[in-house]
Structure formats: C-alpha cells, structure tokens
C-alpha cells in the first residue's frame, strides 16, 4: 500500500490530510497506484444563501483526523483493501464560475485517466457538475442524491444558470446523468414553485420526500433505490443539509425536519452492492459550525462512502 498505518494512529502529528492519509499529487511517482482519491474543492461561488462551504475541505480534513481505520458494523478496513490517498485541493478561480468549473473538470479528468475513483469534499453543490463532466466520460450514469433540495431548477435570480440549485438540471441536459436511474432522497422545505419537481417527473427522476422517508423502513426504502440504480455505474452526491440542522447546523441552506445523524450514516450503509464510480459530500459551512459537529459528521459520512467504494 502507499500508506503505512497512517490511518491507525489518531494522534500522529502531521500536516492535516483526509483521515491522515498520504498526500499524493498528480506529479507524485505513485499517483498511478492510487485506487481512491480524496479531493477537496474549496469553492462556493454557486452559493445563494449563507456562504462558507469553500472552507469545508479544510474543516473536514481536521475533523477526519479522528476517523479510525475499521468500520464499526461491517469490520471493513478500507485502507488495507485499496490504495487510498489525499490528492489535495483543486484550485478554483473565485472570480469566474466557468473558469473554475473548467479547472475542476480538468483536474478530475487527470484523476479518472489514472484509474482513480474520486471522493470529493466541497464546496457548494455546484461542485458536482464539473466533477460529473469528468466522471461520466463514457455516457450518462446513475446517481443517488441525498439532499433537502432537488437542485433541479433551470435558473436562479433573473436567469442565472449555474448555482448550487441547478447542477443536476444541467447534468441531465448535458447527458451526464440518466434521469431514470437518478433517485433523490430527503427532499423537503418550502419552495419557490414546483418547476424542479415538474422537471423531475417529466424525465423520470424518482423523488423520495422526507414524509415517505420517515414512513418507510430505511432498509426497504434503500432496496428500492438499489433496484432503480441497478448494477451500472452510479455516482453518490451527499449534501449535508439532508441531515436535520439539529445535528448538522453548519450549512448554507438548512431545512428543519430532517434525518438524525444515525440515519445519515445508515442510508450510506444501505448502498452496498452499487457500482459507485465517484462520490461527493458538499455544503459543510464552517462559519456556521460552532461546535464542529457538522464537519465531524461530514467526515464520518465520507468514511461510510469510502467503505462502500472499496467494495464496489
């Protein structure tokens, strides 16, 4: 492996990386040996409410130093199964959305060309679009999307097409996602109108609102998700505002009435068997995370995703 017990010593003092893993950049001689790369995208130019997700990767890195090497339920030891490394951050251009997206896509094209599966920490949810432009290189893929919002609006504020509320509308239009293999879970909160839901229905996206989420057994619900997604390539996108703000207050657009922190982990554990080619965890906003609980939950969700990806 490219690491040597880095993730087993929670008190090791070093430059912060995700889960104390080695930092392996694209010019590193062992870049091509990496199986799963953890990547930060410190960019929130798509934010329309409370800013701050650009600081998410650094805060989640710090929180992740207390993530240990073994899964508490499955016993999975991901760092012994695959070569996993922190690939560093993508350098965005905070003054130019399109240049930033191009930079992100180019970075991920390099990652994908090396055969590395990316696990991303944002950043706001617009981050997912340029990542998908690189990940869905062979054609449209499926997606499991945990969020309190659909992020399917056509535009915000006088026609702005690229915000954290529009990435998956663009992804469907650009043929990056197969809408009939997209499931959105946890949708709730007040709405401007029904445009996003109408679009979802018109293209075949399955929306599981929070009312249905709480009425059904999670294992049963996630079995339906696995049936919809099938065994083809899929992406997992996790907005931390999927979780109730009691447990995850540090986010830009919180919505009350959401899942608790255990349910936040449980839904990822139920992704077993999916062909996951990439994943992201976005919208952690440290300025609103006074206790650090949101960042630690985000780091824990990352570890759950990682355990699914090593067995994918």
Show the residue positions of the predicted features:
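Active-site flanking residues adjacent to catalytic metal/cofactor-binding acidic residues
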Residues: 39, 123, 146, 185, ...
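Short glycine-enriched, charge-decorated loop/helix-capping segments at active-site entrances
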Residues: 157-161, 249-257
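Gly/Ser/Thr-rich active-site loops/lids in small-molecule metabolic enzymes
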Residues: 145, 255-269
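Single conserved hydrophobic/aromatic residue that forms the stacking wall/gate
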Residues: 1-7, 11
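N-terminal catalytic or cofactor-binding beta/alpha core of small enzyme domains
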Residues: 23-120, 125, 188
